Amino acid sequence: MTNQNMPPETPIIWLNFSPALRRFDRPLLRQLGKSQAILQWDYHQTADEPNCLTVGLDLIGEYLENFHQPVHLIGHSTSGLLALLYARQCPEKVRSLSLLSVGVYPALDWQAHYYSQFDAMRYSRHLLLGQMAHHLFNCRSLRQTQTIVNILENDLLTSISPHSLYKQLIILPNHIAVPLLVAVGETDGIIDTSLFNGWQRWKKPGDRLWLCPEGKYFFQFEHPEITAFQLQQFWRSLQGQEASSSTSLLA
């Protein structure tokens, strides 16, 4: 028998604006999918489409028109940036926001790091991507390094990331009205501890900041079980608040 006084289950939506990096999300999605439904929304930018965050925000808005209640949004890196910008723009549509590898300056991502290094060092693209592969994954073989280089090179071409060799976008920290979880890898060299700790100033009661032990930029790929646990605990805490609110109204 269904308890009519309990709030309906909130849809959980994983946003992906970086199709080349999708494989690094799969272990976490599989882990989460063992206990709950996760909706995946993917954006594949075509060659003739503008690389514009506004386009991404409009598409998120169109998709969320299909839902008649606020949703849990999740995103890693640039996808997390788009989720954050949408939550700021339409907080009434978002029940909670979970950001993976997103610092307090949320536009900073691996591509921003790559382009700043490229401009400073003037290494060849292939050599610098090889260094990035080791930086992001601790590659143990030439074959593994080359595989990661190919993925990163593809991401440079297909991601909606706002950065280029000529311009790296900076978005300043700001208040986020919806419940927030920020998760960052403890040993991440892209989103370092200063970018993680900067969230403390903007943290609200009920928000959570979590450092994944020994995690790097793609910690959700390397540590899916503990990451899934943190997400589930966050969502359960919100369900508890909703249940308490329903009980108070009926008292």
UniProtKB/Swiss-Prot annotation:
Biological classification of the source: Bacteria, Bacillati, Cyanobacteriota, Cyanophyceae, Synechococcales
Family of this protein: To Anabaena PCC 7120 alr2406.
Entries under InterPro entries matching the protein: AB_hydrolase_fold
The organism's place on the tree of life at top rank: Bacteria
Protein name, entry field: Uncharacterized protein sll0249
